[in-house]
Swiss-Prot record:
Annotated metabolic or biological route of this protein: Amino-acid biosynthesis; L-arginine biosynthesis; carbamoyl phosphate from bicarbonate: step 1/1; Pyrimidine metabolism; UMP biosynthesis via de novo pathway; (S)-dihydroorotate from bicarbonate: step 1/3
Domain Glutamine amidotransferase type-1: 173-360
Enzyme Commission number(s): 6.3.5.5
Superkingdom in the source lineage: Bacteria
Purpose: Small subunit of the glutamine-dependent carbamoyl phosphate synthetase (CPSase). CPSase catalyzes the formation of carbamoyl phosphate from the ammonia moiety of glutamine, carbonate, and phosphate donated by ATP, constituting the first step of 2 biosynthetic pathways, one leading to arginine and/or urea and the other to pyrimidine nucleotides. The small subunit (glutamine amidotransferase) binds and cleaves glutamine to supply the large subunit with the substrate ammonia.
Gene3D superfamilies: 3.40.50.880, Carbamoyl-phosphate synthase small subunit, N-terminal domain (3.50.30.20)
Alphabetized SMART domains for the sequence: CPSase_sm_chain
Name of the featured protein: Carbamoyl phosphate synthase small chain
Matches recorded under NCBIfam families: CPSaseIIsmall, PRK12838.1
Active site: 248, 333, 335
Organism: Staphylococcus haemolyticus (strain JCSC1435)
InterPro entries per UniProt: Anth_synth/Amidotransfase, CarbamoylP_synth_ssu, CarbamoylP_synth_ssu_N, CarbP_synth_ssu_N_sf, Class_I_gatase-like, CPSase_GATase1, GATASE
Similarity-based family: Belongs to the CarA family.
Record's keyword annotation contains Protein transport: no
Gene: carA
Length: 366
């Protein structure tokens, strides 16, 4: 017989369902993701650190989970909410069920709830604090706890690598600042022959320049970009000296370093089907996104940044490029995983930028 579990929101709303995953109950910011597949990559994305994910697709876990498709070694989210969790996955690569993996990593979850209702509430009222309890009598107490709980805004230190390491390639060298990187960023660079050195989020400009890389990338990551001040100062120190490419949180930090400002979105962009328009070509890409903060377009007016991409759903800034220096960024995930590969060409643009900058430097020093 399935045991009861309750998902409780800070506004007093609660949903009765069934236990899924760990008995180590937790609280977090509840968000929703609209992707139909890719749940393994989603739950292992460090950008979800501290959050509780509501999957809008009604059946999650139907093709199981395997050891190769994790985007980080250890998932760091605080909970999973699904309409139905598959107990009998069918796929030749399947090794574990969703429930087994959630238990393994001490992540609580709930199934059998109306995920459409939860999603509508988040969409209408914005993200809320939420938590789980297995005892109906504890709901009122949990509501009070949620109201008084201050969720952390800075989760980058939790998920960033503590020591540098190298993913070997044979061509250009790239330093990747790890704010909670997805592994597929490294894969995309390695596929293009790059030698990738992954370094902690608080690595200084001087330390990066001492490595003499051909380019620098800033990864995705969780939390509020305003609190990662050390990275903002680092960007100021390398800009113009090395080609630069930022993704997601890296995009936001790039904008902040040049005088832009960020804001917390009502419910964010999380899914694998977000249309983005390239203002230079008019082309529309379907993109994978996962962010709760965005850059204020009006704050960029008197900066050296130009907006290159916008979200077609709400007009928010999705891409930036420096007007004179070799640096650009996107708010979405060109490496996908999960999601479409429409924007993989951005890695090729970064490769071209690095090669042209290197040739220019060599010519100048000849």
């Amino acid at each position: 017989m399935l045991e009861r579990r309750y998902l409780v929101l800070e506004d007093g709303t609660y949903y009765e369902g069934y236990k899924l995953g760990s008995n180590d109950l937790s609280v977090g910011e509840i968000v929703f993701n609209t992707a139909m597949t890719g749940y393994q990559e989603t739950i292992s994305d460090p950008s979800y650190t501290g959050q509780i994910i509501t999957f809008t697709y009604p059946l999650i876990g139907n093709y199981g989970i395997n050891r190769d498709d994790f985007e980080a070694l250890t998932p760091t989210l605080n909970g999973v909410v699904v309409k139905e969790a598959s107990t009998h996955p069918s796929n030749f690569r399947n090794q574990k069920t969703l429930h087994d993996v959630l238990v393994q990593y001490k992540i609580p979850g709930i199934s059998g709830v109306d995920t459409r209702s939860i999603t509508r509430k988040i969409r209408q009222h914005g993200v809320l604090k939420a938590g789980f309890t297995d005892n109906r009598d504890d709901i009122d107490s949990l509501i009070n706890t949620l109201k008084s709980t201050e969720l952390p805004r800075d989760e980058v230190e939790t998920v960033s690598t503590k020591t540098p390491y190298v993913s070997t390639g044979s061509d250009l060298s790239v330093v990747l600042l790890d704010f909670g990187k997805k592994q597929n960023i490294v894969r995309e660079l390695n596929m293009r022959g790059c030698n990738v050195t992954v370094v902690p989020y608080n690595t200084t400009a001087e330390e990066i320049l001492a490595m003499s890389p051909d380019g620098v990338m800033l990864s995705n990551g969780p939390g509020d970009p305003d609190v990662v001040e050390v990275a903002i100062e680092m960007i100021k120190g390398i800009l113009g000296k090395i080609p630069f490419f930022g993704i997601c949180l890296g995009h936001q930090l790039f904008a902040l370093s040049q005088g832009g400002t960020s804001f917390k979105m009502k419910f964010g962009h999380r899914g694998a089907n977000h249309p983005v328009k390239d203002l230079r070509s008019g082309k529309v890409d379907i993109t994978s996104q996962n962010h709760g903060y965005a850059i204020d377009k009006n704050s960029l007016v008197n900066t050296d940044l130009e907006v290159t991409h916008i979200a077609l759903n709400d007009g928010t800034v999705e891409g930036l490029r420096h007007k004179t220096l070799p640096a650009f960024s996107v708010q979405y995930h060109p490496e996908a995983r999960p999601g479409p590969s429409d924007s993989n060409y951005l890695f090729d643009e970064f490769m071209t930028m690095m090669k042209e900058f290197k040739e220019k430097e060599q010519t100048a020093n000849a």
